[in-house]
From Swiss-Prot:
Protein name: Holliday junction branch migration complex subunit RuvA
UniProt function note: The RuvA-RuvB-RuvC complex processes Holliday junction (HJ) DNA during genetic recombination and DNA repair, while the RuvA-RuvB complex plays an important role in the rescue of blocked DNA replication forks via replication fork reversal (RFR). RuvA specifically binds to HJ cruciform DNA, conferring on it an open structure. The RuvB hexamer acts as an ATP-dependent pump, pulling dsDNA into and through the RuvAB complex. HJ branch migration allows RuvC to scan DNA until it finds its consensus sequence, where it cleaves and resolves the cruciform DNA.
A GO CC term attached to the entry: Holliday junction resolvase complex
Family membership: Belongs to the RuvA family.
Length: 203
């Protein structure tokens, strides 16, 4: 089995790239997020998940072991295969997925093409216990909310305030994490103002 490929992107297509490794071209399927980071002519290291079937051998590539882990985790849900797993990872990062599952936010998944209400419910239900077992950024999220005086209690209040101002819980948590990571010494008032400013600039 192939576990990793290091080579140059020879050509790219809608859902895969050809990786040239010492003159041999490997077709590697990947999420849209990963494909957007791969430039033709540049060299990369991709972690590979190999799927062997009677009629084909497919390689799936990831820039991080975390994304690869979530690719496999998603396929443990009844009704999700490799294509759907990549579609979900094309729309959401592993951190996004973990936050959505922890918050039982089915709407995040329902917004993805091909994911209906029943499948979204299964994702949240079937992965609620499993998602905590994967080494992801949950610890980083917790730490980022507990540095330089921004305590978990304070960050929770900020998140509640943002929700009252029209944010979804998912948006509020992501906004708080991103801002504190960039500016650990930010005050609570400035944190709220920055979150609102960033949100308005995205519309």
């Amino acid at each position: 089995m192939i576990g990793k490929l290091s080579g140059r992107v020879d050509s790219s297509y809608d859902d895969y790239v050809i990786i040239d490794v010492s003159g041999v071209g490997y077709r590697v399927f990947a999420s849209a997020k990963t494909l957007s980071k791969l430039s033709e002519g540049e060299s990369y290291k991709l972690f590979i998940e190999t799927h062997v079937r009677e009629d084909h051998i497919n390689l799936y590539g990831f820039l991080s072991l975390e994304e690869k882990s979530f690719f496999n985790l998603l396929q443990s849900v009844n009704g999700i295969g490799t294509r759907m797993a990549l579609s979900i990872l094309s729309a959401l990062t592993p951190t996004d997925i973990q936050i959505a599952i922890n918050n039982e936010d089915k709407n995040i998944f329902k917004a993805i093409s091909g994911v209906g209400a029943k499948l979204a419910e299964r994702i949240v239900r079937e992965l609620s216990d499993k998602v905590a077992k994967i080494s992801s950024s949950s610890a980083a999220i917790k730490d980022s909310l507990n540095i330089k005086g921004i305590t978990p209690v304070a960050s929770s209040e900020v998140i509640k305030a943002l929700i009252n101002m029209g944010f979804s819980r998912f948006e509020a948590q992501n906004a708080v994490q991103e801002i504190i990571t960039k500016n650990p010494e930010i005050s609570i008032d400035e944190l709220i103002r920055t979150a609102l400013k960033n949100r308005n600039s995205n519309f």
